[in-house]
Amino acid sequence: TLGEPDEKGRRKPVPLDEVETDESVAALVTTGTDKFYSNGLDLDWMGSLPESERAASGQMITDTIRLLGRLLGFPMFTVAAINGHAFAGGAMLTLAHDVRVMRTDRGFWCLPEVDLGMPFAPGMAAIVQARLTPQVAHEAVITGRRFAADEALAKAIVDAVAPETEVVRDAIALAVTQAARGRSSVGQLKRDFYDPALAIMAEGALPS
């Protein structure tokens, strides 16, 4: 998992260094707990910061964008086991994975920034555009639609759906099918394929 979530499903990701440097790890599966996969950044905390500390808020956004970019180009097969709600940065986190498996009986996938009055940072727009079709990206971003599992599957936002008890199992099974691929070739292919998006995400620029 990417760290323990709080009661609202917000989580602080652990560094990917540990995974990447462990040669025994051949694939990566992420998941959440209970009804949340991830709700992304802690907007309440960010909004509560005094003016003198607002730089920390901007740095958190930059760090998140760069994390998404690192995961998008990660040198092994990655699968998101979406066990519950995936909103905002949490939804973008799922897009950084190679494959997504979503729980059928609970949870929505959503980019709610339009309802929050929040602009997309260039790197956030880049990952959405890189991983979704133009039509689906437009619908998700401009309408803020909440996609249930079957709807997300029909739109190719996710690659598979499964009941709660089988989400992680199916995600691991998918990871196993690709685990034999060499890290160097997988990483290079991802970097080549997503180079334009990765370049934007590496900058970590804030919304204009």
Describe each PLM feature range.
Residues 15, 63-75:
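Catalytic-core regions built around general acid/base machinery
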Residues 30, 42, 93-94, 152, ...:
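Hydrophobic/aromatic residues within transmembrane alpha-helices
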Residues 99, 139, 143-145, 160, ...:
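Well-ordered beta-strand positions
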Residues 48-62:
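A short acidic, glycine-rich active-site loop
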Residues 1-31:
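Conserved CoA-thioester-binding segment of acyl-CoA-metabolizing enzymes
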Residues 88, 144-151:
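Acidic, divalent-metal-coordinating active-site segment for phosphoryl/phosphodiester hydrolysis
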Residues 102-103, 107, 153-204:
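C-terminal long alpha-helix characteristic of the crotonase
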Residues 67, 71, 81, 87-140, ...:
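CoA-thioester-processing core
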